[in-house]
Regions:
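Solvent-exposed loop/turn and edge beta-strand elements of beta-rich ligand-binding domains
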Residues: 1-470
Length: 470
């Protein structure tokens, strides 16, 4: 058989090739690619010849004058070790420090308009200098999350092991590649004017941090707001100019949950109920020092999404029935928003607030329909939701060269021992005696004095009549 046929070999399940009965002389292995459906994400070194020689004693040795190459080593036991490299990508979302979710850093909960911080950790392969493509793409549904492109920072280590910050346009380019459906950024390390910092990071990690803003259209169900990043890199090291470079892709995901609360407002007059529109409530949140962020330089103002919310004073909280003590002003409460019931037909009497983080909330009714009594105290609207995300974990590349490291398998919401699903809080107002509002307190006071005067007048009249009869 021809020489090419005899020595064309494929690695076994252990990554080994065995060639026997070689005669004295010089030989070389050249990688040409993967067998069909055997893609593993390792970069093919097909511009490297693994040269070796069989000497007079039948030993495997390095040929005289061979160029040193760190991609392979000739061992003393007649074997050769060849090194192939591949990068890695890990995506994490910064938690709100509430102890909720899984431990891996892939899920958390936030409020609409909150700034959500993400971290991408990239392992840089040792042969990155030989690659044509090395870039990161991060994609989000723009109705749920939107990148803050100016927040991107990239750091790593230089050749001396010192911390270094990568410079935009020099060490990488940053491009907004969003479309009508998605918010997307692309970080291309091969498009910068210098590769020095990238090459110095070979065999080490670089860290990318950036933020996104949770949008009003964020999903409030167990589907959550999933977003992903993928690292694209060349499959081989000898991509020529103009040659097609279909890269490998490593994908990783993270999810942000958010919740909602709502009201179904009913009016009751005897045995008759109807849905009430135009009823107003204020929603208050109990301050949680672990998860609610104070405005920098203040002790009484919370940053809630894009809002600045001041704590109620002890007197204000007590007047609303929020159980604050004047001495300590604990717990602290702040107003989140105002809800007004609206809707038509069967949807009348409804009001909802989307995009709330986990926490303790109360509703305080501030206005109701004419003829109905205001509630005498606040209504619990707590979102004490424990969520758990189960991930499908994978380490196999598909036949088209993609690795989906993590995908959401199932998500559960729990309220104590019970499954949690959203349901509006049904609140009932009852018909009551409705004094005219014109004149306010003065009218009520005058009415009371008038009654006393009439009664007193009757008493005087009766007294006078008795005296006359006498």
């Amino acid at each position: 058989r021809g020489l090419g046929d005899v020595y064309k070999r494929q690695t076994n399940g252990s990554g080994e090739i065995t060639v026997q009965n070689l005669l004295k002389g010089k030989y070389r292995f050249v990688e040409i690619g993967y067998a069909e459906n055997k893609e593993s994400g390792y970069i093919i070194n097909n511009n490297v010849a693994y040269e070796f020689e069989i000497n007079d004693q039948g030993k495997l040795v390095t040929p005289d004058g061979a160029t040193p190459n760190s991609d392979f080593v000739i061992n003393n036991d007649n074997t050769m070790t060849v090194y192939n490299h591949k990068p890695d990508l890990e995506k994490d979302v910064t938690k709100r420090n509430d102890g909720k979710g899984t431990d891996e850093g892939n899920d958390t909960d936030y409020a609409v308009d909150d700034t959500v911080e993400y971290t991408l950790t990239i392992y840089v392969p040792e042969n990155v200098a030989k690659l044509k493509t090395f870039k990161v793409v991060d994609t989000m549904n723009k109705n749920q999350l939107k990148h803050n492109i100016n927040s991107v920072t990239i750091s790593g280590k230089n050749a001396d092991g010192q911390d270094v910050t990568f410079a935009a346009n020099t060490d990488y380019t940053l491009t907004d590649t969003s479309d009508s459906n998605n918010s997307e950024i692309t970080i291309d390390f091969k498009a910068g004017t210098s590769q020095d910092n990238l090459n110095a990071a070979a065999g080490k990690t670089i860290t990318i941090t950036y933020t996104a803003t949770l949008q009003p259209g964020a999903d409030t169900t167990t589907d959550g707001n999933v977003n992903e990043a993928h690292l694209d890199y060349s499959r081989k090291t000898d991509i020529k100019h103009g040659e097609d470079d279909t890269p490998y892709e490593i994908h990783d995901k993270a999810v942000v949950y958010t919740f909602k609360t709502g009201i179904l407002k009913k009016g009751q007059d005897g045995n008759t109920e109807k849905l009430l529109n135009g009823v107003t409530f204020d929603l208050y949140k109990k301050y949680d020092a672990k998860t609610d962020k104070l405005k920098e330089g203040t002790t009484d103002t919370v940053i809630f999404g894009i809002k600045e919310c001041k704590f109620l004073t002890a007197t204000e909280a007590k007047a609303l029935g929020l159980n604050a003590t004047e001495a300590e002003n604990e717990p602290k409460w702040f107003k989140v928003t105002t809800l007004t019931t609206a809707g038509e037909g069967v949807n009348a009497g409804c009001a909802t607030v989307n995009g709330l983080p986990d926490g303790e909330y109360k509703l305080v009714e501030t206005m109701t329909n004419k003829g109905y009594n205001l509630l005498s105290g606040p209504v619990d609207a707590n979102l004490t939701v424990d969520y758990a995300t189960s991930w499908t974990v994978n380490d196999k590349f598909s036949s088209d060269g993609k690795l989906i490291k993590r995908d959401v398998k199932t998500t559960t919401f729990k309220n104590g021992q019970d499954d949690y699903t959203y349901a509006p809080i049904t609140i009932i107002n009852r018909k009551g005696f409705d004094l005219p509002t014109t004149g306010g307190f003065g009218t009520l006071l005058f009415s009371g004095i008038g009654v006393l005067l009439v009664v007193a007048g009757v008493g005087v009249l009766l007294s006078l009549k008795k005296k006359n009869r006498a």
